[in-house]
Amino acid sequence: MTIKTPGTPVSKMDRTPAVTPGGSSRSREEKIVVTVRLRPMNKRELLAKDQVAWECVNDHTIVSKPQVQERLHHQSSFTFDKVFGPESLTENVYEDGVKNVALSALMGINATIFAYGQTSSGKTYTMRGVTEKAVNDIYNHIIKTPERDFTIKISGLEIYNENVRDLLNSDSGRALKLLDDPEKGTVVEKLVEETANNDNHLRHLISICEAQRQVGETALNDTSSRSHQIIRLTIQSTHRENSDCVRSYMASLNFVDLAGSERASQSQADGTRLREGCHINLSLMTLTTVIRKLSVGKRSGHIPYRDSKLTRILQHSLGGNARTAIICTLSPALAHVEQSRNTLYFANRAKEVTNNAHVNMVVSDKQLVKHLQKEVARLEAERRTPGPSTEKDFKIQQMEMEIGELRRQRDDAQIQLEELRQKLQGDQQQNKGLNPFESPDPPVRKCLSYSVAVTPSSENKTLNRNERARKTTMRQSMIRQSSTAPFTLMHEIRKLEHLQEQLGEEATKALEVLQKEVACHRLGNQDAAQTIAKLQAEIREMRTVKPSAMLKEVGDVIAPNKSVSANLKEEITRLHSQGSTIANLEEQLESVQKSIDKLVMSLPSNISAGDETPKTKNHHHQSKKKKLLPLTPSSASNRQNFLKSPCSPLSASRQVLDCDAENKAPQENNSSAARGATTPQGSEKETPQKGEESGDVSSREGTPGYRRSSSVNMKKMQQMFQNAAEENVRSIRAYVTELKERVAKLQYQKQLLVCQVLELEANDGAGYSVENEENTIMEDEEQNQVAWHITFIEERQQIIELWHVCHVSIIHRTQFYLLFKGDQADQIYMEVELRRLTWLEQHLAEVGNATPARNCDESVVSLSSSIKALRREREFLAKRVNSRLTPEEREELYMKWDVPLEGKQRKLQFVNKLWTDPYDSRHVQESAEIVAKLVGFCESGNISKEMFELNFAVPSDKRQWNIGWDNISNLLHL
């Protein structure tokens, strides 16, 4: 289980508590570190005298030179985290650019280092140096940190044509699937992960991954990377001391060497290289789209991570939980200024992308259980005993005191109000029987003392001043007070009532606040109880769950010779004279093809089931004959026919599997056609005989029975004509196909000889002659032999690889491999075979696995038919193991070729291992020797290279498709 927590220094690791499940973890936002490296001019650019288009003005800025600013709206200056010029070393790029990102994996933070740029800009060169420096620093850190145990695991993969391949297990040869894991994200199924024992072992594993990567040659780079390579180091560190704290870090460090973007017009790629470039550009376009959308900051919009397997695997490194550094490599040449500017635009976008990296800590199950138990105990203790008063408690106490004071003031006010009411009632009762002018002094004095209208001291002063006016004054004051006393009392009562209402409202508010606080305390206790219950349930689950375990340049050197030149000129003259013949033959073939199409369209389409049965049986009988094997131990004549050169792709395997197809097929076709033609002719002859034997024919011509029998005879004749016509159409179509093939080969031979004659004439016109070269002919021959030997080895290796790709007959491979050893006379055979295989590879790529329709064009070759023919050929060779090899030889070969001694179908297993590795010359040699022994090439002494004469001449045993139907032959004009 992985828990995400903030980064913690190693020195404080033991004091860092683990993060509780479900708790939030802080993450550190950080932008992608972008550096740019400008490489020096290479040899191609120096030879082409290209100009320098970019220069580094300082450590952070790169600018384009003024002469290359074609348009004003182009940005000419770019600023990045670090810029390295042509003189900088890879060590400087690592130290100042990506070292901090790489070493963060030792602290539990995921890290990724990209190398991005166009083809031949120096990405692979830079990544190799960066990887080497990172490995050194990782193991130096391990040595300096003895208090922790480190485990380093490595895995490698490449994305080739959108297929994921394991670089550490290249023997599997199959594409790996991508799976979605809820915790880990996108993972690669069945990806091999090796544990590195030390730094040398880790370097050895990295070198294996680099050696297994797909590399090809283009016009811009001799060793161009044709796939994206990802090398991942998984680093886990654990504290040696036993501690209850979280003490295990786990992080991954990715070294991503991207394939370079390229333009087909500059790389001159075609075929396989063109397809590879298309896949590379598509994945890089998806990466650019992801970077562009992340740089805008609109995380709510859709980001197409799943449009490419590259972005899907590296999703966490692009805006996720990782620190990322991108090294953009540039070519300074003016010829690549547009691609370099696009790379800088990409880097400008990438530096705006923000990642959220955090430390990844791992906790074992036992430690997690202990931690959860402590949390439960702590929460229960807090529930039982309240903690110290907090700020809320202090506020509650203040509010309670205010409420008590307000209640006391309210009670005092109520008491005073009651006293006033009682006194007022008493005064009213006394004043009912008395004159208000003679009322006594004390009540008035008491009311005056409360109302604070007249004080006793003022009365005494008044009496002392004028004792004589005492009665008058007292009377006036009595009258004044008696009239104002009720109004004053009512005003005071209203004031007290208003004060009482205010006090009541304040007390009610205080009570409501107190009730809310009490309710919050109750809810807090309920939440704590629920949390404790959840934690206890998790502990019970953790206790029950147990812990779970994870093309070379080829030089054709033809020595000028008068006799050779004369022979070639005669041959080319003959071929020019045959040009009209070939053209006439092609026109004739076109007319035949049109006639066949017309004939097929004129045939009736509705055939009854009873009429189809004989044709089906006949076809089934012929297909059974075709499946017979041609070689038997006692057949010597068949063996020579069997060794005949193929005239079309994969015809060697057809010769092995078709029963004497080239020698006996015409007789079989004639016999089967004769049977198909005899039936209608015989029936035409038998019909009048039956009519003569039956008696009066002329007397019955007008009867209904005679009309019915004649209609039946006409139907039979039509059906028989249809069957024979269909047989002729099939035979004609096969013959026309053979003629087209031979015409194409004649044209090829003509072009080849024309090229040779033109080359000789050019040499003669330049002043070369046999007499002038007699002095240096020995030296030229030696040089030619050495050059031809090198060319022969390279061409033979290409032929062997194309044999493997096109699933060519292994008997044909053995014949060709054993006959041609590198003589000068072998040159034309090697060139023709190489061109034939190149055409076959393109043809198979266009056709694919499509299976040709029966009885239409059996010469069409598809990939599935080639594999099927090769499998039948291996089964045939497996049957000859017992008859051609002694028991001792068989056992020795079984042990040598790793065939289990007690397994089933050991002969077939042994044969299936032959001709399977085109890159191992020893394997190819031994396979050819074994196949030759099984077939019997070694026993026949008349095998020569003329058997591979490419069948330029029309064979004498062509099929006799004309089986006697004059009307059809006249129709086709043949």
From Swiss-Prot:
<protein>
    <recommendedName>
        <fullName>Kinesin-like protein KIN-7A</fullName>
    </recommendedName>
</protein>
<dbReference type="InterPro" id="IPR021881">
    <property type="entry name" value="NACK_C"/>
</dbReference>
<dbReference type="GO" id="GO:0007018">
    <property type="term" value="P:microtubule-based movement"/>
</dbReference>
<dbReference type="InterPro" id="IPR036961">
    <property type="entry name" value="Kinesin_motor_dom_sf"/>
</dbReference>
<keyword id="KW-0206">Cytoskeleton</keyword>
<dbReference type="GO" id="GO:0009555">
    <property type="term" value="P:pollen development"/>
</dbReference>
<feature type="region of interest" description="Disordered">
    <location>
        <begin position="1"/>
        <end position="29"/>
    </location>
</feature>
<dbReference type="Pfam" id="PF11995">
    <property type="entry name" value="DUF3490"/>
</dbReference>
<feature type="region of interest" description="Disordered">
    <location>
        <begin position="663"/>
        <end position="713"/>
    </location>
</feature>
<dbReference type="Pfam" id="PF00225">
    <property type="entry name" value="Kinesin"/>
</dbReference>
<keyword id="KW-0963">Cytoplasm</keyword>
<keyword id="KW-0547">Nucleotide-binding</keyword>
<keyword id="KW-0493">Microtubule</keyword>
<feature type="domain" description="Kinesin motor">
    <location>
        <begin position="31"/>
        <end position="353"/>
    </location>
</feature>
<dbReference type="InterPro" id="IPR019821">
    <property type="entry name" value="Kinesin_motor_CS"/>
</dbReference>
<dbReference type="GO" id="GO:0005874">
    <property type="term" value="C:microtubule"/>
</dbReference>
<feature type="binding site">
    <location>
        <begin position="117"/>
        <end position="124"/>
    </location>
    <ligand>
        <name>ATP</name>
    </ligand>
</feature>
<dbReference type="GO" id="GO:0000911">
    <property type="term" value="P:cytokinesis by cell plate formation"/>
</dbReference>
<keyword id="KW-0505">Motor protein</keyword>
<keyword id="KW-0132">Cell division</keyword>
<feature type="region of interest" description="Disordered">
    <location>
        <begin position="605"/>
        <end position="649"/>
    </location>
</feature>
<feature type="compositionally biased region" description="Polar residues">
    <location>
        <begin position="638"/>
        <end position="649"/>
    </location>
</feature>
<dbReference type="GO" id="GO:0009524">
    <property type="term" value="C:phragmoplast"/>
</dbReference>
<dbReference type="InterPro" id="IPR001752">
    <property type="entry name" value="Kinesin_motor_dom"/>
</dbReference>
<comment type="function">
    <text>Probable plus end-directed motor protein that functions in the NACK-PQR (ANP1-MKK6-MPK4) MAP kinase signaling pathway, which is essential for somatic cell cytokinesis, especially for the cell-plate formation and its expansion. Regulates the activity and the localization of ANP1, probably by association through the non-catalytic region of the kinase. Functionally redundant with NACK2 and essential to promote the progression of cytokinesis and for cellularization (formation of the cell plate) during microgametogenesis and megagametogenesis.</text>
</comment>
<dbReference type="InterPro" id="IPR027640">
    <property type="entry name" value="Kinesin-like_fam"/>
</dbReference>
<feature type="coiled-coil region">
    <location>
        <begin position="362"/>
        <end position="435"/>
    </location>
</feature>
<feature type="compositionally biased region" description="Basic and acidic residues">
    <location>
        <begin position="683"/>
        <end position="693"/>
    </location>
</feature>
<comment type="similarity">
    <text>Belongs to the TRAFAC class myosin-kinesin ATPase superfamily. Kinesin family. KIN-7 subfamily.</text>
</comment>
<keyword id="KW-0597">Phosphoprotein</keyword>
<keyword id="KW-0067">ATP-binding</keyword>
<dbReference type="GO" id="GO:0005524">
    <property type="term" value="F:ATP binding"/>
</dbReference>
<dbReference type="GO" id="GO:0009558">
    <property type="term" value="P:embryo sac cellularization"/>
</dbReference>
<dbReference type="InterPro" id="IPR027417">
    <property type="entry name" value="P-loop_NTPase"/>
</dbReference>
<feature type="compositionally biased region" description="Basic residues">
    <location>
        <begin position="616"/>
        <end position="628"/>
    </location>
</feature>
<keyword id="KW-0131">Cell cycle</keyword>
<dbReference type="GO" id="GO:0008017">
    <property type="term" value="F:microtubule binding"/>
</dbReference>
<feature type="coiled-coil region">
    <location>
        <begin position="565"/>
        <end position="603"/>
    </location>
</feature>
<dbReference type="GO" id="GO:0003777">
    <property type="term" value="F:microtubule motor activity"/>
</dbReference>
<feature type="compositionally biased region" description="Polar residues">
    <location>
        <begin position="666"/>
        <end position="682"/>
    </location>
</feature>
<dbReference type="GO" id="GO:0048229">
    <property type="term" value="P:gametophyte development"/>
</dbReference>
<keyword id="KW-0175">Coiled coil</keyword>
